[in-house]
């Protein structure tokens, strides 16, 4: 970062200027070259970048779209050597010079002026090196900086084969493609995962700087930990909302911290500029290169920050300055933040809750500013296989889709990478809570001293770096370590199980937990993404948190759930879904659209079982460096096929590309319906004994063009899933629950409002021509409802056998809700509408009719009008051509004959003209079965 040359000296001594004489050179300037001995090539390079990107830019790699698993030549060590950097003769005149690297991926040897100045071995750490003396003795006319990157797969293998490498029972560690990822601190999915490629890139993936201070009193800010919490707040206990706000600021600096420093702060509304508070920080301390101070915001009430759908995202700019004994500013930094408390409640169910009908056990839900809320969202993976391609504009489009989809929380999955600050900034602005995790996933990890020391530095840096963001919701130790890896090692080595539990606790509880709590009081920590919670916490104990593990009681509920079932015969059997307090992962994979496949695959390969398409399906992963493991990939293709054939019309079009497109769409229908069934089930749990308060499906978006669990494709196009999730994440919904074995049908209204809501549910039976069924098939036409705050209520139940539709294959029940209530923090009542549907047979068995859809575009309103003229249109689907990123305001809906629906299209990137508008199409389930 560049030091901001702004001061707040008026707080102390108006006449004194800041200490000057600092020069920061951003190394993102042109002039770098990349050389690879393995490829015997030298090409222009960039910083930030990764070697694959530079080789692609130079034409060494013909097309990024054709990359399947890896390039043999790029498995070799690669080097990065810049052109000579003429930094100017003033460099030698400065008192001190440092090299600062915000992120190097991963193993490097760094040379400056022909001298080795250091090495790095952790992708997630910030590194800095004092090169003052090296520069003064430099004999080069223009100092040359060279960074040599080693091959992460080769180094991981070398560590694994070393004499002191820890070993685990056979069959426990999960190799996706490259082995031994658990030995190194690099993005774990770079070695392959079931939703992405294994490129194992190398390069300077974040910015780098040369920092020079001419004045020895000047400091450079490396990192800032800004912690805002209620007085008396402790991480794992609910904060007292009546207490004053505490602002604790800690700055990590380069340079010599002056004796007796003071600190000042100014807090301004980020939008109006109105000053909330300003003055000196108290209890200023110096520890190593960190300066820390604290203040209490007494007598002032900042505007609170709320997640999407719960209120405003009020933000404040906090300027923190360090002063020397002459009251001169020697370091200054500004961070944008918000005032909120976020708390993961894992405490035991209280007597009051038991009296309300909540089942015994322990809570597992989030509370924002003291209020329980329903977490609606998904899991976010790395948006690209190469982080330098992830830009602010790209992430803004993605997060706009998140908020448009009625989501308020994303789980930042481990093991990708810790998110950039600009991504947290966007989440702050848009009200998206980010459940964040340390980068450990689906593996057991070493616990030797060197590994733990490396991890400790990684944890401290990243906790401090992102702590000021109000969107930060949680720190979790890793992905599925407790729920997947410990059971696996227990089965593999029952006698040695205690050893591995001890190692788990050593890393995630004895090491990471205290480091988190030492650097923040505002965020809760959980050792694993999926857990039964804890029994008790004693921060002075060697193992400060005692996990519950399997110490559970029948009839009680604990923790969160993680659920995948690829047996498609039970996909819609909600008795198979887990009953818990919170669902953090669940899902099924589907194909991307034809338009997305065309970005990456040659036209000749556009059919369902082509080798290119099959091998892009990494469910199931190759299990090693086998680029042609058709057997594993075909299993995933078979699961999607079974999902379609079990429930939907089987596409059989004469045109092969059209048939491929129809099959891709069919897999999306199955995926969307399966997620809808589960989300409805979990949301209904808010009013059940389990008191279920969270649904985060797997996964939000894609990292490349391939069959995955994503709801948003690689370029931003929405699958059917994201439209359906948007609908079923509305504040108040009506949902049918059908036990297709017994025939029992139940209808529930679910609300995530914080106050009771009232309204009416209309039930209308029609046949597939759109005609009303006599007597409404024995169902009442209208039912009033009243649903409690953050709750669910049943409004109707019957057995389908007791109803009177004349032909189950020619019947559909339309459920329409109209209600009123107050949105969270709203002062006026709002109207809510929701529509759902139920068919007493699966879609493949319906007596479908051609709805004869008509589509018109109005250039004045820039909207599309869809009309069904001859029958009920199921899964009405508007599709748009390539060249634009955007989404329709509604999609995947039911349309009765004679009804018109006006729908807008939101353009996120690109532009549209009348030719493009005329290329928009509309289809329905009928078109899936029609042979063209």
Swiss-Prot record:
Query: Which pathway is recorded for this entry?
Result: Glycan metabolism; N-glycan degradation
* A GO MF label: beta-mannosidase activity
> Which InterPro entries does this one have?
Beta-gal/glucu_dom_sf, Beta-mannosidase-like_N2, Beta-mannosidase_GH2, Beta-mannosidase_Ig, Galactose-bd-like_sf, Glyco_hydro_2_Ig-like, Glycoside_hydrolase_SF, Ig-like_fold
Reactions the enzyme catalyzes: Hydrolysis of terminal, non-reducing beta-D-mannose residues in beta-D-mannosides
> Does the record bear Glycosyltransferase in its keywords?
no
Q: Name one GO cellular component term.
A: extracellular region
- In terms of superkingdom, the source organism counts as Eukaryota
Active site at 480
Q: Which GO terms describe its biological process?
A: glycoprotein catabolic process; polysaccharide catabolic process
Among Gene3D superfamilies, the record links this protein to:
Galactose-binding domain-like, Glycosidases, Immunoglobulins
Q: Name one Pfam family in it.
A: Ig_mannosidase
- Assembly and interactions? Homodimer.
Query: This protein is called what?
Result: Beta-mannosidase A
Origin organism of this chain? Aspergillus clavatus (strain ATCC 1007 / CBS 513.65 / DSM 816 / NCTC 3887 / NRRL 1 / QM 1276 / 107)
